[in-house]
Amino acid sequence: VLALKADVRDYQQQQDAVKATESSLGSIDIVIANAGLGVFGSIEDITIEGWNQVIETNLTGVFYTLKSTLSSLKKTKGYYITISSLAGTNFFAGGTAYNASKFGVTGFTQAAMLDLRTHGIKVSTIMPGSVSTYFNGNEPSQKDAWKIQQEDIGELVVDLLKMNPRTLPSKIEVRPSFPPTK
């Protein structure tokens, strides 16, 4: 096990993490870009700082992650997976920054998939709906039992990795089976 700390918004830190990983483990076969945060509010209320924080973390961080691992993934014919959101195709009031970032992640990942599959690199994006996490200060509890659980996304990733190499699920939408009880 190798634990590293890096800010996804800092390309140099991403590159340093890749070098440390390759030095310790030898190669990089799988990359999962899963950093994300949300700043919500109407376009009138969202600040420049809030906007930049969301875009730099959720979208630019995904770009930096792929860019810094690309040569490694080419060598191993690896797999690059992004965790986007259903907010990457479904907009909502108060979601200007978050929607823009997740629409961007979805589009970026799909375009990268077209660019990289000719190199033998598989690229997929998983677009979950409501997931029981600590996102934006939420404390998972019984009230979140109806939501997708973190381990469900983990199982989905494992399923992707087990698929026959000739098959590429490029964009996967996943949502809770049942809506919340009112």
Where are these regions (language model features)?
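Residue(s) in the substrate-gating loop at a strand-loop-helix junction
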Residues: 85
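Active-site-adjacent segment of SDR/Rossmann-fold oxidoreductases
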Residues: 90, 111-121
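Substrate-binding pocket helix/loop in short-chain dehydrogenase/reductase
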Residues: 42-43, 50-52
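The beta1-alpha1 cofactor-binding region of Rossmann-like NAD(H)/NADP(H)-dependent oxidoreductases
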Residues: 5-16, 48
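C-terminal helical subdomain
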Residues: 125-126, 133, 142-182
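Active-site loop immediately N-terminal to the catalytic Tyr-X3-Lys motif
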Residues: 44, 92-96
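Active-site helix of classical SDR
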Residues: 66, 101
